[in-house]
Regions:
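Serine-esterase "nucleophile elbow" of acetyl-processing enzymes
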Residues: 1-40, 49
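Alpha-helical cap/lid subdomain in secreted, periplasmic
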Residues: 40-188
Length: 188
């Protein structure tokens, strides 16, 4: 997709409509793990101040094949998307390789690793279940910290039968019956 800019982010428009503070914590290409980490850290750093009485989080889940890693030499977190290794051209993969190895290893080794991971290690059903457990734990953590939230599938529907147990936003209605994701709803 194409970035429309931070001024047209749906959550910013919602904050303006509700006349409330807006804090943008999302990053294009982020993993679910990164989103949960950012939410957790924000709550731990802001909930004690009393500035926010009952923050509302709008969470758009990404694909389960994305995962967060901490760069040893940069001392910061990045996300890897091995399911899309075929979409990385050499230049893009070089940028990832710099984050991962600081150019100490060949970019082709990274490509082989990502292909190996997707072919032999990644199991979509298992990762969907892992995401569902994480969402349920996030649900209880947010409730326990007086936070409200709404969650939806941005890219793929991995939530299975937990949707009725959480504050889930569905895009399906009488007219739209496709995959219950923001991406597919927008393309409909």
């Amino acid at each position: 997709g194409k970035c429309v800019g931070l001024d047209l982010v749906s959550t910013k428009l919602l904050a303006e409509k509700l006349n409330c503070d807006y804090v943008h914590m999302g990053n294009t290409g982020s993993s679910n793990e990164r989103m949960f980490k950012n939410i957790y850290e924000w709550i731990e750093n802001n909930n004690e101040t009393g500035h926010y009485e009952k923050p509302l989080f709008i969470i758009g889940l990404s694909g389960t094949a994305r995962w967060m890693f901490r760069s040893q030499h940069k001392k910061k977190y990045f996300d890897l998307q091995p399911a899309h290794v075929q979409n990385y051209d050499d230049e893009a993969l070089e940028k990832v390789n710099e984050k991962v190895t600081n150019w100490r290893d060949d970019v082709n080794e990274l490509r082989k690793f990502m292909e190996y991971y997707i072919t032999w290690i990644y199991d979509i059903e298992e990762h969907d279940l892992k995401l569902q457990r994480s969402v349920m734990m996030l649900h209880h953590y947010l409730k326990g910290n007086n936070c409200d939230y709404r969650i939806h599938n941005s890219l793929e529907d991995s939530l299975g039968d937990i949707k009725d147990k959480i504050n889930y936003i569905s895009f399906q209605d009488d007219n739209y019956k496709g995959e219950d994701t923001w991406k597919n709803f927008l393309m409909w």
